[in-house]
C-alpha cells in the first residue's frame, strides 16, 4: 500500500493499488501511525461516499503502533455505513487487534495461522518534567479505559477479564481469538486445490 496523504482511488486501468481499492480491499500491513491512519480513513470515507451498499474488507497484518491513530481507524470503521469485514492474516497485535475487533460483529475473520495479541497501551514520553509525566500517565490511563471498553463491548467479555488480560501481552491463535470474541470466524484451508 502506498504511504502518504489519503489517496483517492481513481478508475485508471492497470494500477494495482487502485484495482484493490475498487474491489474495496485494504491492506493495513504495517505499524499504525498518523500517516497510515489518515490514508486508511481517507480511503474508507471515499468508499463510503462512493457506494454505501458495498462492504469494505481490510486485511490486517500489523504489529500495532500508536494509540490515537489506531483509535481513529476504529472510530472511522464505526462511522462508515458499509459493513467492515476485518480479516486477520499474519499478526494483529496491540492496536492492530483493536482495529480487528472493530469490524462488523459476525464479519470478523482470522485466517487459520493468524496470531492476535492484546495488551495495555504504553507511553513513549519519559524524559520530561515530573508534572508532564504525571499528565501523560493520566492520559495513558484514559486511553487504556477507552480501549478496554472497546474490547468489553466488542467481545462480550466482562470488564475484569479484559482488564486483567491487558496487564500483560496475551497472544492468541485464531481459534483462541474466536473463543475470546475478537473474531467471529476462523477461515478454513481449502485442501481441494492442493496437489
From Swiss-Prot:
This is ATP-dependent Clp protease proteolytic subunit. It comes from the Eukaryota. It is an enzyme of class 3 (hydrolase). It catalyses: Hydrolysis of proteins to small peptides in the presence of ATP and magnesium. alpha-casein is the usual test substrate. In the absence of ATP, only oligopeptides shorter than five residues are hydrolyzed (such as succinyl-Leu-Tyr-|-NHMec, and Leu-Tyr-Leu-|-Tyr-Trp, in which cleavage of the -Tyr-|-Leu- and -Tyr-|-Trp bonds also occurs). Keywords: Chloroplast, Hydrolase, Plastid, Protease, Serine protease. GO terms for biological process: protein quality control for misfolded or incompletely synthesized proteins. Belongs to the peptidase S14 family. Its EC number is 3.4.21.92. The active site is at residues 94, 119. It holds the Pfam family CLP_protease. The lineage of its organism: Eukaryota, Viridiplantae, Streptophyta, Embryophyta, Tracheophyta. SUPFAM superfamilies: ClpP/crotonase (SSF52096). It is found in: Plastid, Chloroplast stroma. The keyword Protease applies. One of its GO terms (molecular function) is ATP-dependent peptidase activity. Component of the chloroplastic Clp protease core complex. Cleaves peptides in various proteins in a process that requires ATP hydrolysis. Has a chymotrypsin-like activity. Plays a major role in the degradation of misfolded proteins. One of its GO terms (cellular component) is chloroplast stroma.
Amino acid at each position: 500500500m502506498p504511504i502518504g496523504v489519503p489517496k483517492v482511488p481513481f478508475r485508471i486501468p492497470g494500477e494495482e493499488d487502485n484495482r484493490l481499492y475498487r474491489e474495496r480491499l485494504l491492506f493495513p500491513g504495517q505499524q499504525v501511525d498518523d500517516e497510515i491512519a489518515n490514508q486508511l480513513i481517507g480511503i474508507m470515507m471515499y468508499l463510503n461516499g462512493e457506494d454505501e451498499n458495498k462492504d469494505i474488507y481490510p486485511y490486517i497484518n500489523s504489529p500495532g503502533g500508536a494509540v490515537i491513530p489506531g483509535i481513529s481507524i476504529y472510530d472511522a470503521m464505526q462511522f462508515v455505513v458499509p459493513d467492515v469485514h476485518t480479516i486477520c492474516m499474519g499478526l494483529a497485535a496491540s492496536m492492530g487487534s483493536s482495529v480487528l475487533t472493530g469490524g462488523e460483529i459476525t464479519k470478523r475473520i482470522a485466517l487459520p495461522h493468524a496470531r492476535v495479541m492484546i495488551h495495555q497501551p504504553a507511553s513513549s514520553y519519559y524524559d520530561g518534567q515530573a508534572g508532564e509525566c504525571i499528565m501523560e500517565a493520566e492520559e495513558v490511563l484514559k486511553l487504556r479505559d477507552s480501549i478496554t471498553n472497546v474490547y468489553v463491548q466488542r467481545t462480550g467479555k466482562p470488564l475484569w477479564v479484559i482488564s486483567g488480560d491487558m496487564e500483560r501481552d496475551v497472544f492468541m491463535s485464531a481459534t483462541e481469538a474466536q473463543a475470546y470474541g475478537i473474531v467471529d470466524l476462523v477461515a478454513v484451508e481449502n485442501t481441494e486445490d492442493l496437489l
